[in-house]
UniProtKB/Swiss-Prot annotation:
The gene is CYSD1. It comes from Arabidopsis thaliana (Mouse-ear cress). It catalyses: O-acetyl-L-serine + hydrogen sulfide = L-cysteine + acetate; hydrogen cyanide + L-cysteine = 3-cyano-L-alanine + hydrogen sulfide + H(+). Belongs to the cysteine synthase/cystathionine beta-synthase family. Pathway: Amino-acid biosynthesis; L-cysteine biosynthesis; L-cysteine from L-serine: step 2/2. Transmembrane segments: none annotated. PROSITE patterns: CYS_SYNTHASE. The keyword Transferase applies. GO terms for cellular component: cytosol. This is Bifunctional L-3-cyanoalanine synthase/cysteine synthase D1. The lineage of its organism: Eukaryota, Viridiplantae, Streptophyta, Embryophyta, Tracheophyta.
């Protein structure tokens, strides 16, 4: 008899990746393609951004740029990358300083502080450039600090090329035809998409952005409610050679689809997951995609959006439940 092998991980960072995929069954009326969701809320701290947080930190360590217990990691974030950095920083011994628009959800701020991060909030009207400028200002005043720069750091898409893409190919037994993913930094779509296109020359990649801020489609930056995508700029890490088409989704569509995922699929996801699902359903209804398999990335779980408009109606109901 083979000796039992211990499968206990050395630390929490070894739990990153290998997230499951599941078919959507109950919100796909009218779809001629199958849709499978890759559940990135199953990461240790509930988002896809933990992959790139680990990838960027390891890359900097390998290059001798940072040292645990000595270096400070500084980053501009809408929340989830910051949470990934804070979680890994806690596990490895790094101080983490983050800049974030004040409009991001309360849950994000609480989680970051609970993980020991230092958080600086900026005026949301200044957009992504506002948090980048603040991060650069902090970095300039702190020796032994580094900005990881997720929007342009090549280890971001490379992490998805090494992990997310191969996982999708493996777990679909090579049957996947289409990838749908929201565009924040562009890393998930570009890295995973490049790997999958190398495996299948006919593979298609669809990006998702808010209708209200459709910059990648040639529009102007605007205000929207889909936290994590639609940053109001074209990120350096977005590879247009990988991207086949951009699907626009309104904030209302994203929120309503996220609600349906909870009510009909039992999947409590964030607003950007709702946006990705709404886009995937649009693609799955196209006649040319009959019989194909679409994989859609669900970037984060719903718990960190409880204070947002996504759960406004049920939050009000919960606060007014009668005592019987």
């Amino acid at each position: 008899m083979e000796e039992d092998r211990c499968s206990i991980k050395d630390d929490a960072t070894q739990l990153i990746g290998n997230t499951p995929m599941v078919y959507l069954n109950n919100i796909v009326d009218g779809c001629v393609a199958r849709i499978a969701a890759k559940l990135e809320m199953m990461e240790p701290c509930s988002s896809v951004k933990e992959r790139i947080a680990y990838g960027m930190i390891k890359d900097a360590e390998d290059k001798g740029l940072i040292t645990p217990g000595k270096s400070t990691l500084i980053e501009a974030t809408s929340g989830n990358t910051g949470i990934g950095l804070a979680f890994i920083g806690a596990a490895k011994g790094y101080k983490v300083v983050l800049t974030m628009p004040s409009s991001m959800s309360l849950e994000r701020k609480i989680i970051l502080l609970a993980l020991g991060a230092e958080v600086h909030l900026t005026d949301p009207s200044k957009g992504v450039q506002g948090i980048i400028d603040k991060a650069e200002e902090i970095c300039s005043k702190n020796p032994d600090s580094i900005m990881l720069e997720q929007f342009k750091n090549p280890s971001n898409p490379q992490t998805h090329y090494r992990t997310t893409g191969p996982e999708i190919w493996r777990d679909s037994a090579g049957e996947v035809d289409i990838l749908v993913a929201g565009v924040g930094t562009g890393g998930t779509l570009s890295g995973s998409g490049r790997f999958l296109k190398e495996k299948n020359k006919d593979f298609k990649v669809y990006g998702v952005e808010p209708t209200e801020s459709a910059v990648i489609s040639g529009g102007k930056p605007g205000t929207h409610l889909i936290q994590g995508i639609g940053a109001g700029l074209i990120p350096d890490n977005l590879d247009f050679n990988v991207l086949d088409e951009v699907i626009q989704v309104t904030s209302v569509e994203a929120i309503e689809t996220a609600k349906l995922l909870a009510l009909k699929e039992g999947l409590l996801v964030g607003i950007s997951s709702g946006a990705a699902a709404a886009a995937a359903i649009k693609v799955a209804k196209r006649p040319e995609n009959a019989g194909k398999l679409i994989v859609v990335i669900f970037p984060s779980g719903g718990e960190r959006y409880l204070s947002t408009s996504l759960f406004e109606s049920v939050r009000h109901e919960a606060e007014n439940l009668p005592i019987q």
